[in-house]
Amino acid sequence: MSFVDQASPKNEIKFEQKPLIKSLQDLNIVESWKDGKLKSTTFYHVTENEEVFFGYTSKNKRETSIPEFNSALQRVQDQDIYPTIPADTHLTLAPEGLSASSVYVKRPGLQWYEEMIGTDYLPKAVLDETMVMEQISQSPHENIIRYYGCRVRRGYITSIVLERLDQTLSQYVTTSDFQELDKVKFFESLKSAVEHLHTLGLAHNDINPDNIMVKNGSPVLIDFDSCQPFGKRLQSLGTEGWYEEVFYTSEKKHDIYSLEKLQEWLQAAK
């Protein structure tokens, strides 16, 4: 396992040349609609060196040609989306050469980039989740997603690398395997993971079926971008329908409520 100390973004390598997009598969594309009409199409491309190119158009993706996509792409400055490493911080570097099929590389929420330009929302979100995963990795739990480490490029934390699992609980309940599930054991395993977080002084704050993966019939808790120490102010709230009331700080009671609701949901699922 490798560690990295604080690095300075001053020693940056030169940016890569603007990428040549050859097909829509080279892009992540989000179409924004309102009242049945297209507002805009945003798209981005991430290079192998974690450089991000972003663009938008008023056309839908089917009406936009590959040359038009290429022309619209502009380099996003690292500091707009990635955090630098805080002083006196030791980070676990994800091993190079991990199979792409076995890991999930979690990057900043670039679908929010255009809306959040000029704020520190995206860099802070990456840093917060990285530091939480570092803390959890020092006291791992079998029902919490495995953290391999983060990636650092040009002095910035560009992504975190996690175990890849294929099925959320929302998806799992629609399969025949769900009929054989020991719901009591499943829930107790999930509860154990949440209680483990609480012993670390952390609340997840967003427990719902889409943030629980299923591995060999057991739950694995994921998505720690709202997980913070008790009492800390949050940037993002829980998922609508899974919290008792709107909240702005991290609290154990949010998890307790969500667990109770999830237990009811699990028992009702057929």
What is each PLM-predicted segment?
Residues D182-H196:
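Conserved alphaE helix
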Residues Y104, G109-L127, E134-S137, N143-F186:
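Conserved structural core of kinase catalytic domains
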Residues S2-S71:
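Long, solvent-exposed N-terminal ectodomains/accessory regions
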Residues D128, S189, S258:
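Charged catalytic carboxylate motif
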Residues H198-K215:
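Catalytic-loop of the protein kinase fold
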